[in-house]
Design a protein with these regions (language model features):
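Short amphipathic beta-strand/extended segments with alternating polar/hydrophobic composition
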Residues: 40, 50-51, 62-72, 177
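Short loop segments at secondary-structure junctions
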Residues: 29-33, 43, 52-55, 60-62, ...
């Protein structure tokens, strides 16, 4: 059974503020497994596509294969997140802070563009909370096809949203999951 997930404007605050990092997300699940994903950034003329286990960036009529970075450790990682206020509970804030305090560089306000940066090797880890399925189904195949890892904070399936961690490498992902699980 096929199911489409479409978010026409992921990053509504960016969109209404004129920040060009918003995007359109189109994801397809087959038998509840995300199998195809597109993140389109029309203001940047960038389209990130995952299909058949491959991830591509299409820009200016050219296609480039995507690959996550080789970052292996939190203390060398570039962390992205949309907004601190997405961590609704004090416990979620403490969990997020425990990773935030360990990374090399932090950036916020990137919406779905940070996932595009992760897939292309320019961001190493993304931690978010309060996501809906339409926020993440298109992103899952992109991160995985580019060589990254994505899960819920407890290491489970990210398909239904909630609290998500996406990482460039398995070692980095394992370090983050170990910290995130210790707070639960």
């Amino acid at each position: 059974e096929y199911c489409w997930f479409i978010d026409p404007i992921d990053g509504t605050r960016s969109f209404v503020s004129g920040v060009p990092l918003w995007g359109t997300l189109i994801g397809l699940e087959y038998n509840t497994k995300p199998s195809f994903g597109v993140i389109d950034h029309p203001c940047l003329d960038e389209r990130y596509i995952a299909i058949d286990g491959k991830a591509f960036l299409i820009k200016n009529g050219k296609s480039d294969i995507l690959r996550t970075s080789n970052c292996q450790s939190l203390n060398e990682a570039r962390l992205g997140f949309t907004s601190y206020d997405m961590f609704k509970t004090r416990n979620d804030q403490l969990i997020f802070d425990s990773i935030y305090d360990q990374v090399k560089i932090t950036r916020s306000g990137g919406d779905c563009y940070f996932y595009s940066l992760l897939a292309s090797g320019h961001m190493d880890i993304i931690i978010e909370s309060s996501l809906q399925p339409y926020d993440i189904v298109a992103i899952i195949p992109l991160i995985e096809a580019a060589g990254g890892f994505i899960s819920s904070w407890d290491g489970g399936s990210p398909n239904r949203g909630g609290s998500i961690v996406a990482s460039a490498s398995q070692d980095l992902h394992s370090q983050a999951i170990d910290i995130l699980k210790n707070f639960k």
